Amino acid sequence: MSKVKKNEETLSEVLVDVNRVTKVVKGGRRFAFSAYVVVGDKAGRVGAGHGKAKEVNEARGKAKQAAKKRMMKVPLYQNRTIHHDVVGKSGAAKVILRRAKAGTGVIAGGSMRAIFDSLGVHDIVAKSIGSTNVYAMISATFDALNKLASPKSIAMRRDKKVNEISVKSSDIQVNE
């Protein structure tokens, strides 16, 4: 994950999960709230964070600060979709992210949709397999987003030009 400087005014915030948690002590039960927040600038930067406090608003604020610390830059194709299909895993959760043509929209469920909206993705197809736990789904989605690479970065890594690694499907010859 690459660290990115944050600009407070342009970040959108989505509250993904709020949960009341209990700590049992000698004198009884102590209640608190945990919150999970996704923040993004709708231009290729996104982060997620978790916070816990006695009040919901405090927990949300802590989660937002944690999310801003964990923001990452994601390479987008034409500022609307991802460059290539990718799979991410976290525990029993598995997500498959597929690029989509213009006009397709965001086809994703729950917490994944919050990430893509905050990221600024307009066309993507996402499928979740296995666990549907919010924390696992977000972690698996971030794992997949970490695996994304632009053709330019792949070309630099291989010491080649972009047109040498980008191949059209019509250029592939199949020997039968």
Swiss-Prot record:
Domain S5 DRBM as annotated: residue spans: 11-74
Keyword line: Ribonucleoprotein, Ribosomal protein, RNA-binding, rRNA-binding
Top-level taxon in the UniProt lineage: Bacteria
One Pfam family matching this protein: Ribosomal_S5
Keyword rRNA-binding: yes
Molecular function (Gene Ontology), one example: rRNA binding
Gene Ontology terms describing biological process: translation
Cellular compartments per GO CC: small ribosomal subunit
HAMAP family: Ribosomal_uS5_B (MF_01307_B)
Family to which this protein belongs: Belongs to the universal ribosomal protein uS5 family.
Entry's free-text remark on domains: The N-terminal domain interacts with the head of the 30S subunit; the C-terminal domain interacts with the body and contacts protein S4. The interaction surface between S4 and S5 is involved in control of translational fidelity.
Subunit structure: Part of the 30S ribosomal subunit. Contacts proteins S4 and S8.
Official protein name in the record: Small ribosomal subunit protein uS5
Gene: rpsE
